[in-house]
Amino acid sequence: QADIDTLWENMDVIDCFATDHAPHTLEEKDSQKPPPGFPGLETALPLLLTAASEGRFTVDDIIEKMYTAPKKIFHIPDQAETWVEVDENAQYEIRAEEMYSRCGWTPFEGWQVKGRVTRVVLRGKDVYKDGEVLAEKGYGKDIRA
């Protein structure tokens, strides 16, 4: 808990937020040589929006640390017609059975969160909307090219 408290107390010196998404199954994690990481992509923004709703920081801080700063640090070019829409007031419980990840579990099972991604537009095309993935496999693109 001391480490967690220290992180919250020092948010002002953290340049950016990043997340791992290593969708290993529980069977893989329970092996002699478990792979590192855990599924985190689907829960990152709802967890951060929850923290913002609790007054730990602002939505502008999230934008700065998840979009603006990483873009600057890693020299990521502008992505035309690309954005994420959220419902900051949506409240729900994180449940692995409702997630898209192949691993079937989350370390945040049962956590109550406030804030849900409702739409993702990538290069002008809806790729996620109202809980449904609309993009076909392979629609992603190397943004460094």
Summary of predicted features, one role per range:
Residues E27-G37, L134-A145:
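Amphipathic, soluble alpha/beta structural segments
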Residues Q1-A2, G37-P39, P107-V113:
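A short acidic, glycine-rich active-site loop
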Residues A80-I143:
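C-terminal cap of metal-dependent C-N hydrolases
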Residues D12-V86:
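His/Asp/Glu-enriched, well-ordered alpha-helical/loop segment
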Residues Q1-F17:
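Histidine/acidic residue-rich metal-binding segments in metalloenzymes
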